[in-house]
Amino acid sequence: MIPTTATVDDEPGQIKRALIDASAGAISGGVSRSVTSPLDVIKIRFQVQLEPTTSWGLVRGNLSGASKYTGMVQATKDIFREEGFRGFWRGNVPALLMVMPYTSIQFTVLHKLKSFASGSTKTEDHIHLSPYLSFVSGALAGCAATLGSYPFDLLRTILASQGEPKVYPTMRSAFVDIIQSRGIRGLYNGLTPTLVEIVPYAGLQFGTYDMFKRWMMDWNRYKLSSKIPINVDTNLSSFQLFICGLGAGTSAKLVCHPLDVVKKRFQIEGLQRHPRYGARVERRAYRNMLDGLRQIMISEGWHGLYKGIVPSTVKAAPAGAVTFVAYEFTSDWLESISW
């Protein structure tokens, strides 16, 4: 990435850098979200489904009955047959309204935190931060972004989890029903488990991304020193950045998926759900996040915490890669423009 020439105390440079981070973050988030929306819809359908996806997964008798979705391929076919191609982008508008400000805030706050920790606004200096500081910076940036965009995340989950016939035909109808049934606080239903999830997720995602980038840079230097007769540069190529983002997204998702399942259950509890798509999560079904984890373990088994793990991981890997690569390229392009 092309580093900024501003110092920590250079206010005009700080403003320019913040605008670049915010713009590049919003664009990268929007691109990544639009590309991976079908996988996100499939993932959410599994996560909010109380019934077991397999017969051996049945733990408690009162959850018997056929599951709507039993596998990723079957779910893809069902959604396409019943809802058409557009079904894979259900809830994409609130998702974009959530993701774009989320990534905008996240990358802006992340750069400020790393600048403070390293004493420099130069991006090339941030890569040398310790894994601990990279993790903490990512976690705090994720929390700030979550607080700033959460209502749209809630609406995205609600709209993506419903099928046909629709319970909520528009984002406005879902918003009105939440306000009427839960009040303003309802727009932040599930915020606590979301923050609990985002701390390790964002921390791991950014921490491992920086770690993978350092490894790639070391590998490039090694190839240069060994004088291998190929064109080698210590700067990372777009493919190498893609691989780093791929690894970061996959690692974070595999570790934090159970927390995401509980978060989704909190977000839809007490809301209307067509019987065709299985049992609904009753209001106040879980007292807190630990109780949610415990109840899912008791009623659905350990694999209940990993419902939707396949589409979730398949989505997280390219989503992380596309987000980081799009951010790096957009940031470089904006840096090259005369302001």
Swiss-Prot record:
UniProt entry tagged with the keyword Nucleus: no
Domain of life: Eukaryota
Example GO BP: thiamine pyrophosphate transmembrane transport
Subcellular location: Mitochondrion inner membrane
A GO term for molecular function: thiamine pyrophosphate transmembrane transporter activity
Pfam family, one: Mito_carr
Listed SUPFAM superfamilies: Mitochondrial carrier
Gene3D superfamilies (UniProt xref): Mitochondrial carrier domain
Topology within the bilayer: Multi-pass membrane protein
Keywords: Membrane, Mitochondrion, Mitochondrion inner membrane, Repeat, Transmembrane, Transmembrane helix, Transport
Family to which the UniProt record says this protein belongs: Belongs to the mitochondrial carrier (TC 2.A.29) family.
Function: Mitochondrial transporter that mediates uptake of thiamine diphosphate (ThDP) into mitochondria.
Name by which UniProt lists this protein: Mitochondrial thiamine diphosphate carrier 2
Source organism: Arabidopsis thaliana (Mouse-ear cress)
